[in-house]
């Protein structure tokens, strides 16, 4: 008998992954966590029935939220990751010698423990002495921070449930205050392909656009994401992701990647027409 994991991407679209076995299932104070073994995507983790990452394609997401801002900002030293309890984002950041401190705010201890047990290679990004994990509510954590971080990466999963407060105007305003005068915020922007997800994308862009002087959106192909098409947001007080992009300087760092390139960086900001129109409509509101 074959076993399949199924996730509804819309009322009319279902995403299925054949499963060899279930490795873990548990309920934390915040969410249900499951880990599966599959022949196509390797091990993959789900929260409340939605795929969060897999061994096969997690490198795409991690590289795109890290190397895009790191190739623009000339001297990132202090980083805040909101979420990030799997260690994938911090692992990418740790390739940069100039980074002195990485704060990870992850309120779900069970999520961190599960990732350490079942995804040790990814979770190795939690073990460096530059990394500090805070078991705290991110919104509350941010309220006390001002002019502190060069880069904030919002790695929260979605604008619902336990992460709902991380997609509000108050949250983005607190990010603005917590960033230094030349700081950058990067966040996952979701996918606008299905009607059910479009409203969240619109709302997110509207809030960030009216909070930061520079706000752009870029894209990547992530197979396990809804529709396979995923957007990211880049917001900054000073740096533009293309005008201040320094490809030659980034290449001299000899950073290892499997997805990100300096050519891809430029192309990632060239959005399809329907996405451009959606974003422009929110900028005019």
Curated annotation (Swiss-Prot):
Catalytic activity: S-adenosyl 3-(methylsulfanyl)propylamine + putrescine = S-methyl-5'-thioadenosine + spermidine + H(+)
BP term (GO), one: spermidine biosynthetic process
Record-linked NCBIfam families: MFS_SpdSyn, PRK00811.1, speE
Name assigned to this protein: Polyamine aminopropyltransferase
Residues bound to spermidine: 86
Entry GO CC: cytosol
Record-linked InterPro entries: PABS, SAM-dependent_MTases_sf, Spermi_synthase, Spermidine_synt_N, Spermidine_synt_N_sf
Role according to the record: Catalyzes the irreversible transfer of a propylamine group from the amino donor S-adenosylmethioninamine (decarboxy-AdoMet) to putrescine (1,4-diaminobutane) to yield spermidine.
Keyword terms: Cytoplasm, Polyamine biosynthesis, Spermidine biosynthesis, Transferase
PABS domain segment(s): 2-237
The organism's place on the tree of life at top rank: Bacteria
Subcellular location: Cytoplasm
């Amino acid at each position: 008998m074959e076993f399949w994991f199924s996730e509804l991407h819309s009322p009319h679209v279902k995403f299925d992954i054949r499963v060899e076995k279930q490795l873990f299932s548990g309920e934390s104070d915040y969410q249900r966590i499951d880990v599966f073994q599959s022949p196509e995507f390797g091990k993959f983790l789900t929260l409340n029935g939605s795929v969060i990452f897999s061994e096969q394609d997690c490198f795409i997401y991690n590289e795109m939220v890290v190397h895009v801002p790191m190739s623009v900002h000339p001297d990132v030293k202090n980083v805040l990751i909101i979420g990030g309890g799997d260690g994938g984002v911090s692992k990418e950041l740790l390739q940069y010698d100039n980074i002195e401190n990485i704060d990870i705010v992850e309120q779900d201890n069970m999520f961190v423990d599960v990732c350490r047990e079942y995804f040790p290679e990814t979770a190795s990004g939690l073990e460096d002495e530059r990394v500090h994990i805070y078991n705290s509510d991110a919104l509350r954590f941010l309220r006390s921070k001002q002019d502190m971080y060069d880069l904030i990466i919002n790695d929260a999963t979605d604008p619902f449930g336990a992460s709902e407060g991380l997609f509000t105007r108050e949250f983005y305003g607190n990010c603005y205050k917590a960033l230094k005068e030349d700081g950058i915020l990067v966040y996952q922007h979701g996918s606008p392909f299905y009607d059910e997800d479009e409203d969240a994308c619109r709302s997110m862009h509207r809030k960030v656009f009216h909070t930061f002087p520079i706000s752009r959106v870029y894209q990547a192909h992530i197979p396990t994401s809804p529709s396979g098409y995923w957007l990211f947001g880049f917001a900054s007080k000073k740096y533009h992701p293309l005008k201040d992009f320094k490809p030659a300087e980034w290449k001299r760092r000899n950073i290892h990647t499997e997805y990100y390139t300096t050519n891809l960086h430029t192309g990632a900001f060239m959005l399809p027409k329907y996405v451009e129109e959606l974003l422009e409509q929110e900028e005019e509101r």
